[in-house]
Amino acid sequence: MAVIYYDKDCDLSLIEKKLIGIVGYGAQGHAHAQNLRDSGLKVIVACVEGGRGWKKATADGFEVMCVAEMAKKADIIMMLAPDTSQAKIYKDSIEQGLKPGKMLMFAHGFNIHYGQIVPPSFVDVTMIAPKCPGYMLRQVFTEGAGAPSLIAVEQDASGKAKELALAYAKGIGSNRAGILETTFAEETETDLFGEQAVLCGGTTSLVKAGFETLVEAGYQPEVAYFECLHELKLIVDLMYQGGIAYMRDSISDTAKYGDFTRGPRVINEDTYETMGEILGEIQDGSFAKEWILENQAGRPVYNSLRRMESEHLIEEVGAELRSMMSWLKKKR
């Protein structure tokens, strides 16, 4: 079972005199910076000068500067820029500012695990990865609670890397919920697999397959949309709240029997085999290589697929039906 750390394991005083630099002020960056500041820690923010993040961080009362200047000043540097831009940011603006005693932190392990960023041996390299969106990390903190995080240590030059990372986790409030120990490899590989096989790739493909099956059988696209996409939220919310068993206890016996007997015919042995292949491509680095080369080439495949998917009938039907739902209009 996983090792989980709580408040008793976290000593905020270890970083009270250190200057923390946050790279990026987007979804996660703003939450980290504000939670750390509210915990009494010294925080500076690095963004693209004049950009939206720069303006927002300035408006929120932070000292904002370019990444290179921040890298020279900060004792702890947390990389919260998009994964695809981190390697260039590191090479151009951070690497030269690193000195013994500093710690480089990440919220996702991709660039370290796949060698896109190779820090010098004299710095600590750690990860604190909150398991929630940035807005939720901030919200629960202000309510006096916290969000769970993952912690990993890739490099322990100081001999105190884990303790310092735990202190950082306390600064963003994760000590109030729990900090689960992992590795850069495990976090990266499971995160990518979850995205590709279940949360994004698996779910969207399943939804579209169900929608297309009904439409091709002569059912109205609008009804197919409701049954295969719209109602998905009802089921996911139940699983999110209490797990699979809780969801099953909340649906009809007819739905439950169909779940037990037909579900395994949809997700069958062939699916398991394909999932294993997808995991293998993540583990051996071939997916990472493919994605890195795709970015270097200007994303031709990505852009083509994105355009093609946006033209799927389910998007047209969904837009029409969502326009009928006043509660969705209010959220936009």
UniProtKB/Swiss-Prot annotation:
Substrate binds at residue 252. GO terms for molecular function: ketol-acid reductoisomerase activity; magnesium ion binding; NADP binding. Involved in the biosynthesis of branched-chain amino acids (BCAA). Catalyzes an alkyl-migration followed by a ketol-acid reduction of (S)-2-acetolactate (S2AL) to yield (R)-2,3-dihydroxy-isovalerate. In the isomerase reaction, S2AL is rearranged via a Mg-dependent methyl migration to produce 3-hydroxy-3-methyl-2-ketobutyrate (HMKB). In the reductase reaction, this 2-ketoacid undergoes a metal-dependent reduction by NADPH to yield (R)-2,3-dihydroxy-isovalerate. The gene is ilvC. Gene3D superfamilies: 6.10.240.10, NAD(P)-binding Rossmann-like Domain (3.40.50.720). InterPro entries: 6-PGluconate_DH-like_C_sf, KARI, KARI_C, KARI_N, KARI_prok, NAD(P)-bd_dom_sf. Residues 1-182 form the KARI N-terminal Rossmann domain. GO terms for cellular component: cytosol. Mg(2+) 1 binds at residues 191, 195. It comes from the Bacteria. Mg(2+) 2 binds at residues 191, 227, 231. NADP(+) binds at residues 25-28, 83-86, 134. Coiled coil: none annotated. Binds 2 magnesium ions per subunit. Its EC number is 1.1.1.86. NCBIfam families: ilvC, PRK05479.1, PRK13403.1. One of its GO terms (biological process) is isoleucine biosynthetic process. This is Ketol-acid reductoisomerase (NADP(+)). Pathway: Amino-acid biosynthesis; L-isoleucine biosynthesis; L-isoleucine from 2-oxobutanoate: step 2/4; Amino-acid biosynthesis; L-valine biosynthesis; L-valine from pyruvate: step 2/4. HAMAP family: IlvC (MF_00435). It holds the Pfam family KARI_C. It catalyses: (2R)-2,3-dihydroxy-3-methylbutanoate + NADP(+) = (2S)-2-acetolactate + NADPH + H(+); (2R,3R)-2,3-dihydroxy-3-methylpentanoate + NADP(+) = (S)-2-ethyl-2-hydroxy-3-oxobutanoate + NADPH + H(+). Its cofactor is Mg(2+). The keyword NADP applies. The active site is at residue 108.
